[in-house]
């Protein structure tokens, strides 16, 4: 697949600086993408430092495989498998920093053939790894109104979820929806457009993409695994791009940085007992993009960088 990807990493300096990189440290880039963050980390590592990168997208893996550096290793896997990977590499409790740059990557959104864009026509796929799972086209064809409406409402916060779901199923009864613009136009004709700068299909496309790739479940598993992988003083830095992601990250950090409050006389769970005595995380910072960065890179507009550290 010959395609040139023009990717500007969001808050790159802030993300890299947040790690406080040690020259001989061990780091994990959980979302390699086109390698912008990984390459910056490698520049700061000494000869005995190590960087492990992960990406489920086969094209991202192909890009990463071209990096010939003995300090670098990349695997083609979901980041929810971080713990298994760390066990295999024998780096549990030894990692100095882990980064996540969540959401869809430029590899996916900029290539119409991947089926993520509601602006350019392509096959309605949306799988981050096209070799696994069901495509968006197949899922919409096989699902009923209730199932589609649930996904649009819960993963896209779409007010008109049921109306859109009915329109999709009406078209599906005539023929399967197979292209991105076909779906985008169905949605555009179904709901009112108040903001000319925001496409009416954006929430629905986000919702379907999140569901098809099980993104929120993947994030939850990956975040929990970082608590075992990082060493004391190790940092986790996460960039999210929409409220569902950021809510999940914020909840994870708050839950693991505050002690449990147990009402007197109530039974206590093992998790609550652990939280009574220890707080695993210390929240370091929350950073938003500057207006200058937003002007130069509109994709930065909704981004949030959250940083936390494993307690010493």
UniProtKB/Swiss-Prot annotation:
Reactions mediated catalytically: cytidine(1402) in 16S rRNA + S-adenosyl-L-methionine = N(4)-methylcytidine(1402) in 16S rRNA + S-adenosyl-L-homocysteine + H(+)
Cross-referenced InterPro entries: RsmH (IPR002903), SAM-dep_MeTrfase_MraW_recog (IPR023397), SAM-dependent_MTases_sf (IPR029063)
A GO CC term assigned to this protein in UniProt: cytoplasm
Molecular-function annotations in GO: rRNA (cytosine-N4-)-methyltransferase activity
Disulfide bonds: none
EC number(s) recorded for this UniProt protein: 2.1.1.199
Keywords, in A-Z order: Cytoplasm, Methyltransferase, rRNA processing, S-adenosyl-L-methionine, Transferase
Major subcellular location class: cytoplasm
A GO biological-process term: rRNA base methylation
Organism superkingdom: Bacteria
Alphabetized Pfam families for the sequence: Methyltransf_5
Residues given in the record as S-adenosyl-L-methionine binding sites: 35-37, 55, 85, 101, 108
SUPFAM superfamilies: Putative methyltransferase TM0872, insert domain (SSF81799), S-adenosyl-L-methionine-dependent methyltransferases (SSF53335)
Subcellular location: Cytoplasm
Function as written in the Swiss-Prot or TrEMBL entry: Specifically methylates the N4 position of cytidine in position 1402 (C1402) of 16S rRNA.
HAMAP family cross-referenced by the UniProt entry: 16SrRNA_methyltr_H
Family according to the record: Belongs to the methyltransferase superfamily. RsmH family.
Protein name (database record): Ribosomal RNA small subunit methyltransferase H
Origin species: Buchnera aphidicola subsp. Acyrthosiphon pisum (strain Tuc7)
Lineage per the UniProt record: Bacteria, Pseudomonadati, Pseudomonadota, Gammaproteobacteria, Enterobacterales
